[in-house]
A protein has these predicted regions:
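PLP-dependent class I/II
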Residues: 1-194
C-alpha cells in the first residue's frame, strides 16, 4: 500500500518479485493510501494463485460495492502523472524530517527515521502509552488544543511489545506537526508530575 512512499533513495521491493513463490504471494493495495483518498474504501488484491483469487471473487461478489463517487474518483486518480508521486513524496519527506527532528528534541522520546509510509513509531517515557493517549484526550490541553496519538501496542503481534510506544502519522502540514510536538512535549511534562 505504501510502495510510492519510500525515502532516501530506497526502492520498494514487492513480494510479487520473489521467484518460485507465486502461489503463496498476495499483494493488497488501495487508493486511500496511494492517492491520499482517505475514506475511499477501494482496493484490490493481486495473486497468481487461482484458488485464492476464486475465493476472493466469491467474497467480493457477496459484498456491496463502494459508493459510486468513490469509484469515479478512484478511476480518475489513475490518470495522474508520475510527477504527482514525486511532489507528494517530496512533501512527505519534509513532514517526516520536521516530525523526527522535533521528536528527537523531546526529553525521553526515542524515535527512528522511517524509511517508508507516512508514520513513525515513537517510544515515550511512560509505562503505558494507551493510558497516556487517553489522558491527552480527556484531561490535557494547551490553549484548548491537544494531540491524538495511536497506541502502538495494537500494531504488534507479540503481546506487550509497543506498550510505551505511539504511532504518529505525519499527514498534517509542517507547522501543525511542529505544534503537535510542542503540545506532546508539554503533555509529557505534565503527565510525569502526576
Amino acid at each position: 500500500m505504501y510502495r510510492e512512499f519510500v525515502y532516501d533513495g530506497a526502492q520498494h521491493f514487492s513480494i510479487m518479485q520473489v521467484p518460485d513463490i507465486e502461489q503463496n504471494a498476495i499483494m493488497i493495495d488501495s487508493v486511500s493510501k496511494r492517492f491520499s483518498m482517505c475514506g475511499a474504501r477501494i482496493g484490490w488484491v493481486v495473486s497468481k494463485n487461482k484458488e485464492v483469487m476464486k475465493s476472493i471473487l466469491k467474497f467480493a461478489q457477496a459484498r456491496l460495492s463502494p459508493p459510486t463517487y468513490s469509484q469515479i474518483g478512484a478511476e480518475k486518480a489513475f490518470d495522474v502523472p508520475e510527477t504527482y508521486f514525486e511532489e507528494v513524496l517530496k512533501e512527505y519527506t519534509q513532514r517526516r524530517n520536521v516530525l523526527i527532528d522535533a521528536l528527537q528534541r523531546v526529553e525521553g522520546v526515542r524515535v527512528s527515521m522511517p524509511k517508508g509510509a507516512f508514520y513513525c513509531i515513537a517510544e515515550l517515557p511512560v509505562e503505558n502509552a494507551e493510558d497516556f493517549c487517553i489522558w491527552l484526550l480527556d484531561q490535557f490541553s494547551v490553549d484548548n488544543q491537544t494531540v491524538m496519538l495511536a497506541p502502538a501496542e495494537g500494531f504488534y503481534a507479540t503481546p506487550g511489545l509497543g506498550r510505551n510506544q505511539v504511532r504518529i502519522a505525519y499527514v498534517l502540514e509542517k507547522e501543525k506537526i511542529q505544534r503537535a510536538v510542542e503540545i506532546l512535549k508539554k503533555g509529557l511534562e505534565c503527565y510525569k508530575k502526576q
